Curated annotation (Swiss-Prot):
It comes from Cellvibrio japonicus (strain Ueda107). The keyword DNA damage does not apply. Allows the formation of correctly charged Asn-tRNA(Asn) or Gln-tRNA(Gln) through the transamidation of misacylated Asp-tRNA(Asn) or Glu-tRNA(Gln) in organisms which lack either or both of asparaginyl-tRNA or glutaminyl-tRNA synthetases. The reaction takes place in the presence of glutamine and ATP through an activated phospho-Asp-tRNA(Asn) or phospho-Glu-tRNA(Gln). One of its GO terms (biological process) is glutaminyl-tRNAGln biosynthesis via transamidation. The keyword Nucleotide-binding applies. PANTHER family: GLUTAMYL-TRNA GLN AMIDOTRANSFERASE SUBUNIT B MITOCHONDRIAL AND PROKARYOTIC PET112-RELATED, GLUTAMYL-TRNA(GLN) AMIDOTRANSFERASE SUBUNIT B, MITOCHONDRIAL. This is Aspartyl/glutamyl-tRNA(Asn/Gln) amidotransferase subunit B. It is an enzyme of class 6 (ligase). It catalyses: L-glutamyl-tRNA(Gln) + L-glutamine + ATP + H2O = L-glutaminyl-tRNA(Gln) + L-glutamate + ADP + phosphate + H(+); L-aspartyl-tRNA(Asn) + L-glutamine + ATP + H2O = L-asparaginyl-tRNA(Asn) + L-glutamate + ADP + phosphate + 2 H(+). Its EC number is 6.3.5.-.
Length: 481
């Protein structure tokens, strides 16, 4: 039997406000436990929440960015459940009247395919605290610094049919919120967390299967692995005649295994009701229009501009525009070097590989746009071959200086002098008379491949510094006479 995977996501986006959603306590990451929790966060008697206006502005920006309806009237509700890191015994969130209504995000997938993922809604809520288990023998600690941090929870429709589509959506959402600067996007610090709802059904069946939820995935890689594992598990259970239990599961990225946490609750289990301490929030058209005017360039608009302004392919433009900092680095390099195509190739190729290898972000890279533009200039004027340019780039990464100083210090200037090249070519021809005869007696169709032998010999003699274009022209001239 052929099976179809059905995936929906719930994404928790931590908003980059300086203070919490209902209190003035700081949201800065990394402070000592319980040093950034005030009386409101601790749920002390007599305290009342005060909504954070910046959180509403950020949520409105997000809604506009995902083509959604903005809720002009939104209501906070209490989601009731007990957990040690939830001091109040309930979470203040939104359900019936969220700030962001139905919207959508368009994806570009491999092979030129496109996919529209519908967003059911997005709502504002407060984050819970954090339970600490590792540093306490036989006990657990509670850190309430995170309690009350503002979140947007984005809930999609079950529109995704593979791990590839789910990861593509997650990456697009990450690109949107970081471009808007409403979230720093640092998943290692919990700034974005993904809950994945997964079910399978026989291909062609309209009715959804029983879903499970895998919670708190904090990387694209873990999301892909967790989906593949859960899909395989569900198919095995069904093909063995079993039934899928609606449950919440937890994936361990170290062991590559998942386990059941608890049975999955429905909304009725949380006994939602309107929060009596908070009035409905009313947003008018003037407010929404003012927020729209403040919005920065979004990834899709940036991609379209890169295609038109720099004549880049849709793929290259998409890769460069996904990250706001990468896009800015590319544009500065392109303007300094006056060569957008070479700039794109180097940013997406050698620079991306270097950042990945050294686990650096482009914002603190040792390679600057000025240094990369200087290297590109030496490629354009023929000073460096593409092969030698990579050696110079490695030296730049190691902090040895700019391209010009490295070329001078190491003597890496490309050999374009006709006299010097002819001398090396003559020596190679003289040393290889049999290969010369074979080349001259060969069919035209075989000659290009045979020419590679002579190119390689001259490159070896020049230590890779011969100008490839000049070398090929001179070799053809000498071998064909």
């Amino acid at each position: 039997m052929q099976w179809e995977t059905v995936i929906g996501l719930e994404v928790h986006v931590q908003l980059a406000t300086k203070t919490k959603i209902f209190s003035g306590a700081s949201t800065a990451f990394g402070a000592e436990p319980n040093t950034q929790a005030c009386a409101i966060d601790l749920a002390l008697p007599g305290t009342l929440p005060t909504p954070n206006a910046e959180a509403f502005r950020f949520a409105t920006m997000f809604g506009l960015a995902v083509n959604a309806e903005i809720g002009k009237r939104s209501v906070f509700e209490r989601k009731n459940y007990f957990y040690p890191d939830l001091p109040k015994g309930y979470q203040t969130t939104q359900l019936a009247e969220p700030i962001v209504g139905a919207g959508y995000v368009d994806l570009e997938l491999e092979g030129g395919r496109t996919k529209r993922v519908r967003i059911h809604h997005a709502h504002l809520e407060e984050d819970a605290g954090k339970s600490l288990h590792e540093d306490f023998a036989g006990m657990s600690g509670i850190d309430l610094n995170r309690a009350g941090t503002p979140l947007i929870e984005v809930v999609t429709e079950p529109d995704m049919r593979s791990a590839e589509e789910a990861v593509a959506f997650a990456k697009k959402l990450h690109s949107i919120v970081t471009s808007l600067e409403i979230c720093d996007g640092d998943m290692s610090q919990g700034s974005m967390r993904f809950d994945v709802n997964i079910s399978v059904r026989p291909k062609g069946q309209e009715k959804f299967g029983t879903r499970t939820e895998t919670k708190n995935l904090n990387s694209f890689k873990f999301m892909e692995e967790a989906i593949a594992l859960e899909v395989e598990r569900q198919i095995d259970v069904l093909e063995d005649g079993g039934k899928i239990i609606q449950e919440t599961r937890l994936y361990n990225g170290d062991t590559k295994k998942a386990r059941s946490m608890r049975s999955k609750e429905d909304s009725n289990d949380y006994r939602y009701f309107p929060c009596p301490d908070l009035l409905p929030v009313i947003l008018d058209d003037d407010y929404i229009d003012a927020v729209r005017q403040q919005m920065p360039e979004l990834p899709d608009a940036r991609q379209a501009r890169f295609i038109g302004q720099y004549a880049l392919s849709s793929y290259d433009a998409g890769q460069l525009s996904a990250d706001k900092l990468v896009a800015a680095f590319f544009e500065q390099t392109a303007q300094l070097s006056q060569d957008a195509k070479l700039s794109a190739n180097w940013v997406l190729g050698e620079l991306a590989a270097h950042l990945n290898k050294t686990e650096q972000r482009i914002s603190n890279s040792t390679v600057t746009p000025e240094l990369l533009a200087g290297l590109i200039a030496r490629i354009k004027d023929g000073t460096l071959s593409s092969k030698i340019a990579k050696l110079v780039f490695e030296a730049i990464c190691n902090g040895e200086g700019d391209a010009d100083s490295i070329i001078d210090t190491r003597g890496l200037k490309q050999v374009s002098d006709t006299g010097a090249l002819e001398k090396m070519i003559d020596e190679v021809i003289a040393k290889n008379p049999q290969q010369v005869d074979n080349y001259r007696n060969a069919d035209d169709s075989k000659r290009p491949k045979m020419l590679g032998f002579f190119v390689g010999q001259v490159m070896k003699a020049s230590q890779g510094q011969a100008n490839p274009q000049a070398l090929n022209e001179l070799l053809l001239k000498k071998l064909n006479t």
